[in-house]
């Protein structure tokens, strides 16, 4: 199972952004570095959901281009994307499965259906969704 790490403040930013955009799905991109231990998310991009829908999202192409330019300028690698599920579990929906095609990307899904948010991460390998191991950490407790 692939490990994908993220600082706690980045996770908090994703949760807050997703809650601010309820009842719509919130979405964005992830950038960072790849190491022998796995992936390290160093920057989260918050993009507009062009569909403004509760059950799917479309990333704004202009926002995507700006994010990619910023990644290049900061020598970060695109690692994948993230989106929220306002009222469904943190697992790929039928729509997520239909649209996912990049085996190099991580797909983080944040569920807001319960009292406490649930984050899972996946990647697609030969059309099969495989779970990753997302690890949220603070500077004091890196693992």
Predicted feature descriptions by range:
Residues 1-78, 87-143:
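Conserved beta-strand-loop surface patch within small alpha/beta domains used
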Residues 84:
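Short, well-ordered beta-to-alpha junction loops that form the rim of enzyme active sites
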């Amino acid at each position: 199972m692939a490990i994908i790490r993220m600082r706690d403040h980045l996770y908090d930013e994703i949760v807050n952004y997703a809650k601010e955009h309820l009842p719509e799905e919130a979405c964005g991109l992830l950038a960072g570095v790849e190491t022998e231990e796995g992936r390290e998310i160093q920057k989260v991009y918050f993009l507009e959901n062009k569909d403004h829908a509760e059950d799917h999202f479309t990333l704004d192409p202009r926002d995507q281009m700006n994010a990619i330019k910023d990644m290049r300028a900061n020598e970060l690698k695109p690692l994948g994307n993230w989106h929220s599920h306002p009222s469904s579990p943190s697992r790929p929906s039928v729509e997520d499965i239909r649209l996912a095609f990049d085996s190099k990307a991580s797909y983080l899904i944040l569920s807001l259906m319960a009292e406490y948010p649930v984050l899972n991460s996946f990647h697609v390998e030969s059309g099969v969704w495989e779970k990753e191991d997302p690890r949220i950490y603070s500077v004091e407790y890196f693992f």
